[in-house]
């Protein structure tokens, strides 16, 4: 993909923020227009996150114009909105490779650029890291500024408020910018608010404010009265949230129009030299400047390649995704059981819960980006006699590990975890691979862990977890299902596998959706294939039988080898005193980079060809076939 830079005369001059800072202020609106158009053209040809970046064009330009990046340190939360940042910081010509194998990362990444201060992918980490960076700069007398940009979704997480509370107590110099692209926080944006923001962020007001504090410290009653008066003024003239952030120890400014580049530059210029923790609230529109994305910001959050002129996203008419299989199952159960409750931490669309939320709104809870709360909220519902189902990505369940142990498993409560995006996820890369859930759940007492090999198995396992009366997890991958026939729901025998093919010498123990590769290989190698179904409790009887009747056992999974399903098989063999040769195939001991799912599996030797080579090499090393 190549963009015709003749269409972008100003942007073509910008190879770093230093080039940007050479522009006159009156050139910035044109630059924003070109940057937005370039972003749209690039993403439409490569796929990626679009709507968030369209909404942060003016903010990105203003930040790099006012602050001396990379000396001043700019930290983006999550990173979906950082595409304009990448374009302005020397990676414009590499945008055609974003989210692709060996290409630039979809999120800010420290190894990629000195302008990427913090590697991100998960939400709500920016303020905590930013505070640490600001404290380090303060102790070194570096004179550098620290700016954190966080969205109105990410700031709902408890971690963000923990960091705000700590920052206010430390009174460290830093700026937190709330990028509010929803109507849920405030709507009072306009010329008056922009003007007031200039006043309250100005040096005169700041000097008077700080001077008054020093004097009034000696007269506590008057000091408290003046503090309340200032908070009331800001609460009336700005938004009700100003009082909240002021109470946390921040000087609140806003909300400011996040698409008015002149006002942003003026306000940020004022705020750059303010002391102590500062909080700037800006209002933006997700998808700004591209009508289809403004109309459907969720649909255009992450997009495949599409035609930007028509604005139509390609429709997937192939096999249903595992997410849809889950969503359909949940609706089917809710039709029969008013006590089943669906819970998601801000992943309604991704987890396949849109239809459920619309048809059964009283049985649906989106708890926002609050994974810890989601799990313990489910705990309470289970105690109350309900049947909670927590739909969560594998990579995000990591954030609620203590709750999984302390609140669910220790109490042996019937909470079902529908774990989406287990295994290789593809283009989002290292921060989003579902590589660890089997390993971190397998060691927890009372847990039942299931690994479906196709969509029908997935439905049956969800039903089994729903019925079993214990903590249960069903892990399934991103993407389309196999296309098998769906059968009526029935509870599976807990901890029992199923023999798929009987062969000789080699037995492949499959955990999950790599079963088609195992079956294809079994014909070449005359191997036995067992779909293990359960990681915990594991089918000890089957493992011992296979060990007695075969020379080689091969375990197959999309999870880290360390502590994974293969390790469970090794433990059974060891405790049974079996010396059968065991080959464990799974994800290696490093963070797996971005690529398509097929490319990643091939690189890891977990496609059919790679699995065959590993098995044959293993047997050769054993000395005989």
Curated annotation (Swiss-Prot):
Name the coenzymes or cofactors required.
Mg(2+); thiamine diphosphate
For the keyword Metal-binding, the answer is yes
InterPro entries for this protein:
Dxylulose-5-P_synthase, THDP-binding, Transketo_C/PFOR_II, Transketolase-like_Pyr-bd, Transketolase_BS, Transketolase_C, Transketolase_CS
At the top level of its lineage, which domain of life is listed? Bacteria
Q: In which pathway does it act?
A: Metabolic intermediate biosynthesis; 1-deoxy-D-xylulose 5-phosphate biosynthesis; 1-deoxy-D-xylulose 5-phosphate from D-glyceraldehyde 3-phosphate and pyruvate: step 1/1
Coiled-coil stretches, from where to where? none
Which residues hold Mg(2+)?
152, 181
- Family of this protein: Belongs to the transketolase family. DXPS subfamily.
This protein's name = 1-deoxy-D-xylulose-5-phosphate synthase
Organism (species): Haemophilus influenzae (strain ATCC 51907 / DSM 11121 / KW20 / Rd)
The record lists the lineage as: Bacteria, Pseudomonadati, Pseudomonadota, Gammaproteobacteria, Pasteurellales
């Amino acid at each position: 993909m190549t963009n015709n830079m003749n269409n972008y005369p100003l942007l073509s001059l910008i190879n770093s923020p230093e080039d940007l800072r050479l522009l006159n202020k009156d050139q910035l609106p044109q630059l924003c227009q070109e940057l937005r158009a370039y972003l749209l053209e690039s993403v439409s040809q490569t796929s990626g996150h679009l709507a968030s970046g369209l909404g942060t064009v003016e903010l990105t330009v203003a930040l790099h114009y006012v602050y001396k990046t990379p000396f001043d340190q700019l930290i983006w939360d999550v990173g979906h909105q950082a595409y304009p940042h990448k374009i302005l910081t020397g990676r414009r010509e590499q945008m055609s490779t974003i989210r692709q194998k060996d290409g630039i990362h979809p999120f800010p990444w420290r190894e990629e650029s000195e302008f990427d201060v913090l590697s991100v992918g998960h939400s709500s980490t920016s303020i905590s890291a930013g505070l640490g960076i600001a404290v380090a700069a303060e102790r070194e007398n570096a004179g550098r500024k620290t700016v954190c940009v966080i969205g109105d979704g990410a700031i709902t997480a408890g971690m963000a408020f923990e960091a705000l509370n700590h920052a206010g107590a430390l009174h460290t110099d830093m700026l937190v910018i709330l990028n509010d692209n929803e109507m849920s926080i405030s709507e009072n944006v306009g010329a008056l608010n922009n003007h007031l923001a200039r006043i309250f962020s100005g040096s005169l007001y700041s000097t008077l404010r700080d001077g008054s504090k020093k004097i009034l410290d000696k007269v506590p009653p008057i000091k408290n009265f003046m503090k309340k008066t200032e908070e009331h003024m800001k609460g009336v003239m700005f938004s009700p949230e100003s009082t909240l952030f002021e109470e946390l120890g921040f000087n609140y400014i806003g909300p400011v129009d996040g698409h008015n580049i002149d006002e942003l530059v003026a306000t940020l210029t004022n705020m750059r030299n303010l002391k102590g923790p500062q909080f700037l609230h800006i209002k933006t529109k997700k998808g700004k400047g591209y009508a289809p994305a403004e109309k459907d910001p969720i649909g255009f959050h992450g997009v495949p390649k599409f035609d930007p002129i028509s604005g139509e996203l390609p429709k997937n008419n192939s096999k249903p995704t595992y997410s849809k299989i889950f969503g359909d199952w949940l609706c089917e159960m809710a039709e029969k059981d008013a006590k089943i409750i669906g819970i998601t931490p801000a992943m309604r669309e991704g987890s396949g819960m849109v239809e459920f939320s619309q048809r059964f709104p009283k049985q649906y809870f989106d708890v926002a980006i609050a994974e810890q709360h989601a799990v313990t909220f489910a705990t309470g519902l289970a105690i109350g006699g309900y049947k909670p189902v927590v739909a969560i990505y594998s990579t995000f369940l990591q954030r609620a590990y203590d709750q999984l142990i302390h609140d669910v498993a220790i109490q042996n409560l019937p909470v079902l975890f529908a774990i989406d995006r287990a295994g290789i996820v593809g283009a989002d890369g290292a921060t989003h691979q579902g590589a660890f859930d089997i390993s971190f759940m397998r060691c927890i007492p009372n847990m039942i862990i299931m690994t479906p090999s196709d969509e029908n198995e997935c439905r049956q396992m969800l039903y089994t977890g729903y019925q079993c009366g214990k903590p249960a997890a069903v892990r399934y991958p991103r993407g389309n299902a196999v296309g098998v026939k769906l059968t009526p729901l029935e509870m599976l025998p807990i901890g029992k596998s199923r023999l798929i093919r009987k062969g000789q010498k080699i037995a492949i123990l499959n955990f999950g959706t790599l079963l088609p590769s195992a079956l294809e290989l079994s014909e070449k190698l005359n191997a036995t294939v067992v779909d293990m179904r359960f990681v915990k409790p594991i089918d000890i009887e089957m493992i011992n039988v296979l060990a007695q009747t075969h020379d080689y056992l091969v375990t197959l999974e999309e999870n880290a080898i360390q502590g994974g399903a293969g390790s469970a098989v090794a433990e059974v063999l060891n405790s049974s005193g079996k010396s059968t040769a065991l080959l464990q195939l799974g994800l290696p001991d490093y963070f797996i980079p971005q690529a398509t799912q097929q490319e990643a599996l091939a690189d890891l030797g977990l496609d059919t060809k790679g699995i065959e080579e590993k098995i044959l090499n293993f047997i050769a090393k054993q000395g005989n076939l």
